[in-house]
Amino acid sequence: MVKRHKNTIGVWRLGKTLGTGSTSCVRLAKHAKTGDLAAIKIIPIRYASIGMEILMMRLLRHPNILRLYDVWTDHQHMYLALEYVPDGELFHYIRKHGPLSEREAAHYLSQILDAVAHCHRFRFRHRDLKLENILIKVNEQQIKIADFGMATVEPNDSCLENYCGSLHYLAPEIVSHKPYRGAPADVWSCGVILYSLLSNKLPFGGQNTDVIYNKIRHGAYDLPSSISSAAQDLLHRMLDVNPSTRITIPEVFSHPFLMGCTSLSSMDSTTPPTPSLSIDEIDPLVVDCMCVLWKKSSSKKVVRRLQQRDDNDEKYVYKVLSEILRDDMLKKQRFDENKYLSLYDLIHDNNLFTKASISTTSLVKSNVSTNSRKSSNFEDELARRVSSPLSALNQMSQSPIPIRVSSDKDYDSYACHEVVSNPSTLDDDYNYMFVCPPEEYTYSTDNVRTDSLDLQSLPTPTLEQLESVPFNRYGYVRIFPSTTLSSTASGYYTPDSLSTPEPSIDGLTNLDDVQVGGFVQGSGNQNRRPISFPVISNMQPNITNVRSASAPLCSSPVPSRRYSQYATNARYTPRKVSSGSVLRKISSFFRKD
């Protein structure tokens, strides 16, 4: 039997707090049966719309990419069970130990680039690579790339126009607000990371943001005299202001700096060429998933690429995706099919990729299901979803209610929600959930109906039953693998921070953190690490926040994913701050010209 208490999220028992950000916190957790450790990232639902992030982390199986174990939710928070890396961020490691030797820096850089290349072969662009988003296992000398919150899928025939990232790691084309390709931008960020590993400071610093922007645009930085000529040459090529002439990841692996310092001389040593496939060997199910994942790709083009003798991304992704789907289907057989959301189902979730407007909304009433079914489109869509494993929660409830939290007060009380008349046209910038909690767990209002699921009428279900049933007695719902999430297709705003002008890593001071209403504030010396600057107009910036420096860089037509209650606004007006401050310079940069 599994003893459960209020500090249990599904099959995970919560422990100490590992870290706190502007909108989330991370707690250590232990699996109730196996004893395995995990880091539970807790995000309020009003800030969480992370379907694309979950999809990427399920697809990207790589030794240098952080693993996603599990996802749970209740009516207040999302709980992501991630791989636990006890030694923490690479940022803290460099801050503690100072500059690394060239051999050690090359060893870690090769792991970072190998993981980034793995992402790029899926056409995923991370767009927020930095020391704070890289975790390290010191004893194993292994790194893990984390936080795919700003990652996106980049079609081959188009550029990205969503400008986001961390100030000191931004590529010149992003700072200049030009349409850009994600792969060269990631290479630039890796160049900044290499510079930091070798010198214990960031290459682009200054007294204000204007100075930093100008240095980035012109590629103006000072190279430490202590590093070798091979390292200097690689830095010059990675920090090339022209993305078309910037070195690529395969070229980096062939560079003398990496070849002389590591045994990994090329990407071919870790990703051997994939043989061509005949038309009889090609699985149309896998090809279909590739076309949906890559949006504009045609099946004929993918099949032609799979039949070529030369190695290409299509052959690589086909091989990896077919293995994942096969393993996923084996797992699905151990679960009730109606309660397991396979990777195939997640890829084919229309809400994950489709952007459309909501046609009709109304307040939730006790008879909302009957009223909603007056729409034939809604009834047809509901019948389709009930016959599909896409929404396990729908099948378990007599009348599922797709809702969206419309404001903070509504989020707190669930007194007012909006009903979607046609789920097939859900805007993926909203955070939709299907409300059907078990009967022993009720909300504080009568407007939301409860479901009759009772965990097989057992007062203390076993762990196996907990893993196959998405509810537990405290109202937590397992959504991975159980039901689906909505997300944006081209990245989103994050409430993390922009960087302060201080370029030094070694000179950062410790901060005595005090937990105040879910936000971290300093009670001691002013922290010189990157600060938070939320761009939502009614959010208060926290100048002593110790989380990483991620933020959008301008008004963007893509609404917020984490700030889903503001998603109806096409653009954001930054909050005005005092004249002459760094925050005002940042806010002026956000304004559209």
From Swiss-Prot:
Enzyme class at the top of the EC tree: transferase
Residues the record marks as active site: D128
InterPro entries for the chain: Kinase-like_dom_sf, Prot_kinase_dom, Protein_kinase_ATP_BS, Ser/Thr_kinase_AS
Molecular function in Gene Ontology: ATP binding; protein kinase activity; protein serine kinase activity; protein serine/threonine kinase activity; protein serine/threonine/tyrosine kinase activity
Matching Gene3D superfamilies: Transferase(Phosphotransferase) domain 1
Lineage: superkingdom: Eukaryota
Keywords for this protein: ATP-binding, Cell cycle, Cell division, Kinase, Mitosis, Nucleotide-binding, Phosphoprotein, Serine/threonine-protein kinase, Transferase
GO biological process: cell division; G2/M transition of mitotic cell cycle; positive regulation of G2/M transition of mitotic cell cycle; signaling
UniProt xrefs under Pfam families: Pkinase
Single GO cellular component term: Cdr2 medial cortical node complex
Transmembrane parts of this sequence: none
Positions that bind ATP: L18, G19, T20, G21, S22, T23, S24, C25, V26, K41
Catalytic activity of the protein: L-seryl-[protein] + ATP = O-phospho-L-seryl-[protein] + ADP + H(+); L-threonyl-[protein] + ATP = O-phospho-L-threonyl-[protein] + ADP + H(+)
Residue intervals of the Protein kinase domain: 12-258
EC numbers, comma separated: 2.7.11.1
Function text: This protein, a dose-dependent mitotic inducer, appears to function as a negative regulator of mitosis inhibitor wee1 by phosphorylating and inactivating it.
Summary of subunit composition and partner proteins: Interacts with msp1.
PANTHER family linked: MAP/MICROTUBULE AFFINITY-REGULATING KINASE, NON-SPECIFIC SERINE_THREONINE PROTEIN KINASE
UniProt similarity note: Belongs to the protein kinase superfamily. CAMK Ser/Thr protein kinase family. NIM1 subfamily.
Name of the protein: Mitosis inducer protein kinase cdr1
